[in-house]
Amino acid sequence: MSGHSKWHNIQGRKNAQDAKRGKVFQKLSREIYMAAKSGGPDPDGNPALRMVIDKARSNNMPKDNIQRAIKKAEGGSDEHYDEITYEGYAPGGVAVFVEALTDNKNRTASDVRVAFTRNGGSLGATGSVAYMFDRKGYIVIDRSTTDADEDQVLLDVMDAGGDDLQTSDDAYEIYTDPKQFAEVRDALIKAGYKLADAELTMIPQNTTPVPADKKEQFEHLVEALEDSDDVQNVYTAAADED
């Protein structure tokens, strides 16, 4: 793994989303609903549901909201959302991969296209940038929540089946094969670790610095994509700022 610190970016994104909490909860509700509808309402027997519930909790989503989405799926609602991805480039040639859940593909395609074109980006064809990212399980342990030193954490991560451990001043970042994600997550919890984040994500194989004169446009593009009700995740290959 490169020195790409996803946790730093996640913290910044979550802080920025505080003012948009209602929209974040709406998107999480949609994910919970679809996970419960496709795999059943019991998170113990539905790893996908358990993962999104954990994600909702890490975003401080109220328990009532989580249960409401599950009950909606249990109640036989005929609502359905399709999983769609979009690929393109942000200003400065930075690769962008977008995941959406939508009940109206035309609306979502239009929203995404407008976000790219109005903010100096270009929407590409399917497959144009996906190969530049790797699907990974991603787990974070806040260093302030454990007495274990780095060597012990590394041993526990390896025993759990994790692929890689990165260390920063405030966190341990663990990467896993996506197929082993749930197993690694559960093993670390069983070992006594409190997880600050645990999700499936897309990690860029290489990163691209955002030119100084394109930074504002780049940020506006990401914000415009995240503001879409249908967009669940926006991944970029932008290099971390020093």
Curated annotation (Swiss-Prot):
Keyword RNA-binding part of the UniProt annotation: no
Gene Ontology, cellular component aspect: cytosol
Annotated localization: Cytoplasm
Region called Disordered, residue ranges: 1-22
Keywords tagged on the record: Cytoplasm, DNA-binding, Transcription, Transcription regulation
GO MF annotation terms: DNA binding
Pfam family, one: Transcrip_reg
Cross-referenced InterPro entries: Integrase-like_N, TACO1_YebC-like_2nd/3rd_dom, TACO1_YebC_N, Transcrip_reg_TACO1-like, Transcrip_reg_TACO1-like_dom3, YebC-like
One GO term of the biological process aspect: regulation of DNA-templated transcription
Ranges in a coiled coil: none
Transmembrane segments: none
Keyword presence, Cytoplasm: yes
Family the UniProt entry places it in: Belongs to the TACO1 family.
Name of protein: Probable transcriptional regulatory protein LBA0733
